[in-house]
């Protein structure tokens, strides 16, 4: 099964809504429409930028999509600071990132909570980008494949095969996020293949063949081609490089198979 590459730009806690508009305009200007036939491109801004991004995308009829950096496991109620999937759906979001390593590290999010958030996202018509990844000590001990397979099981616990088919999985080794250190293409392929194999166990071979598995961790225009060229890597969750409109457009074009815009 041919899987269309996905390039997702996670802006993290950067850019106000004015800056968000400028960046989306830059990406749209730098990446001609023809590339979107061969690659899906999405931006993941802070919550406060989403309405502005929605207005621009809808008004200019851009093929770029957008999503949220997190979603509550709750639908509504007395949950101060939480953002419901229903709210995000109203804002036109396509994706919701769940279980990013920074959420797991700084907010103590567990696989169980990530599974609940993924379920909530799906309930509201959002595609969850379910993030897993190991710390450096796990990698150095040689336990990275086992760790990620176990984390995948926990982060998809309770989801049906049909629901799993609607997810995106992002492998983001924690030691490579924002550090400049990048897993080799072979490292990325090793874990992404193990993820796909486990998806086959959790759902079916057909589901596993259709789910997109991304790599995240210091991805840029120089390394994205080799990484996305691996058989089980279907795109990238991009951090810092997604804040540069030209570079993000360039790496999206590379993921589409070129030529450069």
UniProtKB/Swiss-Prot annotation:
Enzyme class: isomerase
Compartment(s) where it occurs, according to its Swiss-Prot or TrEMBL record: Cytoplasm
Binding sites annotated in the UniProt record for substrate: 10-12, 178, 218, 239-240
Catalytic activity: D-glyceraldehyde 3-phosphate = dihydroxyacetone phosphate
Domain of life, per lineage: Bacteria
Recorded metabolic or biological pathway in which this protein acts: Carbohydrate biosynthesis; gluconeogenesis; Carbohydrate degradation; glycolysis; D-glyceraldehyde 3-phosphate from glycerone phosphate: step 1/1
Catalytic center residues: 100, 172
Gene Ontology cellular component annotations, sorted alphabetically: cytosol
EC numbers on record: 5.3.1.1
GO terms (BP aspect): gluconeogenesis; glyceraldehyde-3-phosphate biosynthetic process; glycerol catabolic process; glycolytic process
First-listed, main subcellular location of the protein, grouped into a coarse class: cytoplasm
Subunit composition and interactions: Homodimer.
Purpose of the protein: Involved in the gluconeogenesis. Catalyzes stereospecifically the conversion of dihydroxyacetone phosphate (DHAP) to D-glyceraldehyde-3-phosphate (G3P).
Similarity comment: family membership: Belongs to the triosephosphate isomerase family.
HAMAP family the UniProt entry points to: TIM_B
Classification via PANTHER family: TRIOSEPHOSPHATE ISOMERASE
Record's protein name: Triosephosphate isomerase
The gene coding this protein: tpiA
